[in-house]
Amino acid sequence: MSNFSLSPSPTSGFSLNLQNPTKTSYLSFSSSINTIFAPLSSNTTKSFSGLTHKAALPRNLSLTCRHSDYFEPQQQQQQQQQQPQGASTPKVFVGYSIYKGKAALTVEPRSPEFSPLDSGAFKLSREGMVMLQFAPAAGVRQYDWSRKQVFSLSVTEIGSIISLGAKDSCEFFHDPNKGRSDEGRVRKVLKVEPLPDGSGHFFNLSVQNKLINLDENIYIPVTKAEFAVLVSAFNFVMPYLLGWHTAVNSFKPEDASRSNNANPRSGAELEWNR
């Protein structure tokens, strides 16, 4: 809040005194102009702020002004610009876990990777995936995560699980060392098959590692409800694993207009107009 004092002046009729001149303000009259100047009477006409009034008898008038709300958003914007540019949203880890008597299963998404281009844009360099972590039981409601085995599902493998019916099954084979000198020394096979009683599916991960002489099978049943949660989560996260959310968020009307003007008869444009 800032205070103005209005006092008579022999030459101009009134003088305006600003007690706090450092802030930009506008006048906000609590009463109308007619109420303020109605008691004033004189034969001499003076002009003040575009308003016509007659010279008044000697008296002091007090006017109160407040700062415009327009300046508050500007101050907030300046404060935001002063924040460190390196500051970003902290990374969040999420997952869905299933605990059974002989094993536990944790499902976690992994984000895709992007590489920068010379134009300043980014291109998808690696699709995201879903990490399955199997841990054998070490006791009642206890699991040995130091012996966990992992299996990464690609987007295509996720699609296979999503499309499974109540009596359908699928199988995936992974060799982490494929293309290397020790190819074939580690073998991972994940089987997803329906339970005999039709109550859900079981996930069976078989790991053979000749490098450390390991041969292990981890089996965990998944109920219909738990499987439905997995399918729902897979459907939701699929566009993010493909990186499509970044492209959709970057769509701008001016980009489409500029592209059409640069190549008005492109193949995509002709196909869309059919």
UniProtKB/Swiss-Prot annotation:
Residues 1-54 form a transit peptide. Residues 253-274 are annotated as: Disordered. GO terms for cellular component: chloroplast; nucleus. InterPro entries: ssDNA-bd_transcriptional_reg, Whirly. Single-stranded DNA-binding protein that acts as a transcriptional activator of the pathogenesis-related gene PR-10a. Upon elicitation, binds a 30bp promoter sequence known as elicitor element response (ERE) and is required for PR-10a expression. One of its GO terms (molecular function) is DNA-binding transcription factor activity. It is found in: Nucleus; Plastid, Chloroplast. Residues 100-105 are annotated as: Required for ssDNA binding. Belongs to the Whirly family. Keywords: Activator, Chloroplast, DNA-binding, Nucleus, Plant defense, Plastid, Transcription, Transcription regulation, Transit peptide. Its main location: nucleus. It comes from Solanum tuberosum (Potato). This is Single-stranded DNA-binding protein WHY1, chloroplastic. The lineage of its organism: Eukaryota, Viridiplantae, Streptophyta, Embryophyta, Tracheophyta. One of its GO terms (biological process) is positive regulation of DNA-templated transcription. Homotetramer. A motif (Nuclear localization signal) lies at residues 178-191.
